[in-house]
From Swiss-Prot:
Keywords: Cobalamin biosynthesis, Methyltransferase, S-adenosyl-L-methionine, Transferase. It comes from the Archaea. One of its GO terms (biological process) is methylation. Coiled coil: none annotated. The lineage of its organism: Archaea, Methanobacteriati, Methanobacteriota, Stenosarchaea group, Methanomicrobia. The gene is cbiD. The keyword S-adenosyl-L-methionine applies. Belongs to the CbiD family. This is Cobalt-precorrin-5B C(1)-methyltransferase.
Length: 339
């Protein structure tokens, strides 16, 4: 059984621990809407702001010609997302961002409003409640609505479906979020240069049911728990939650040593080899003939420097369990199993 959102092959022992009928679990997993954890827990994913905006945009276009009460839109991972339309009138539709098991998702339940009119070609505009980028260096140019490239592609694809279904030449859609400006003040948007609302985000179309814990709260979070996983990035974050559901998972990036300084109790360091092993031995590639740790792993998986770097990571970990995973979530090295 494979999770289609992250392509993770769910171990049979995890499936057995859920206690759910296999057919029911397979159906839920195939939809992309649930995540299975190593203790058998099944958590509910939600849809991103990008998926919700796509649904509102498509529904608004369809409502130009007919009454709409639900809509299906594409997602970046190839799955279809199915959302209810809470309100519709000619050229206008409202879709609510569905609830999920991510307790800190402050955008849950927000209303997204799409307003459409016929036009030449496809045009997507940001309305009230969608932030505006006020600085250079972000994925979206300065002065533009804070709709990241991937969700913008998703919205345009959804509008294109509606235009083709109705036989129109095109449509202009304005997306707004009535409570977006208020909610935006509770996010980090102002610090990164986005003002006036929230950002429309989402690389997969689905919201994972856990927190990234980005920013200055990380140290406090690590201090306040006695069972913590320090992970290096979003891939590590995703699989750490699945592998170690009883732990608080905190993304520390390359600041593993800093995270360790905050931590006490039962500590796990989990992440991709490029960060974990190079943290163990920053000079492991010098004179090796390999450009990256991944290249060394692929071409010489028994290379002595891999073992040395792992042993050095274990030593630097001062008793922490060190777990190295690949991009599919498979465990490559584990100090617990090797001790």
């Amino acid at each position: 059984m494979i999770d289609p959102v992250n392509n993770f092959k769910i171990p049979e022992e995890w499936i057995a621990l859920t206690g759910l009928p296999r057919e029911e679990l397979e159906k839920n997993v195939a939809s992309g809407m649930v995540v299975v954890l190593s203790d058998g827990s099944v958590l509910k994913r939600g849809y991103t702001t990008g998926t919700t905006a796509s649904a509102a945009a498509k529904a608004a276009v369809l409502s130009l010609k007919k009454k709409i009460d639900s809509v299906s839109v594409p997602t970046p991972v190839g799955l279809r997302a199915h959302l209810e339309v809470s309100e519709s009138s000619p050229g206008r539709a409202v879709v609510k961002k569905i609830l999920n098991d991510h307790e800190s998702d402050i955008t849950r339940g927000l209303e997204f409003v799409g307003e459409a009119r016929e036009a030449e070609g496809i045009h997507v505009l940001g309305g009230k409640g969608i932030g505006v980028v006020r600085r250079d260096g972000l994925q979206v140019p300065k002065g533009k609505p804070a709709i990241n490239p991937k969700p913008m592609e998703q919205i345009r694809a959804a509008v294109k479906e509606a235009v083709e279904e109705l036989g129109l030449q095109g449509a202009e859609v304005t997306i707004s979020i009535p409570e977006g400006e208020r909610i935006g003040k509770e996010t980090l948007n102002s610090r990164i240069g986005v003002e006036g609302g929230i950002s429309v985000l989402g690389s997969t179309g689905f919201v994972e049911p856990w927190n990234d814990h980005l920013g200055e709260t990380r140290g406090d979070l690590i201090r306040c728990t006695d069972k913590v996983v320090l992970t290096t990035g979003r891939i590590g974050m995703r699989y750490s939650h699945m592998l170690f559901p009883e732990y608080t998972v905190v993304m520390v990036g390359s600041r593993i040593s800093e995270g360790l300084d905050y931590a006490s109790g039962d500590i796990i360091i989990c992440g991709l080899p490029g960060l974990v092993l190079k943290w163990g031995n920053p000079e492991m590639l010098e004179g090796s003939g390999y450009a990256t740790v991944v290249e060394m792993l692929e071409k010489a998986p028994q290379h002595e420097r891999l073992k040395e770097a792992f042993e050095m990571a274990v030593e630097k970990g001062k008793g922490a369990r060190i777990v190295v995973i690949d991009r599919d979530g498979s465990v490559l090295m584990d100090s617990k199993s090797e001790s």
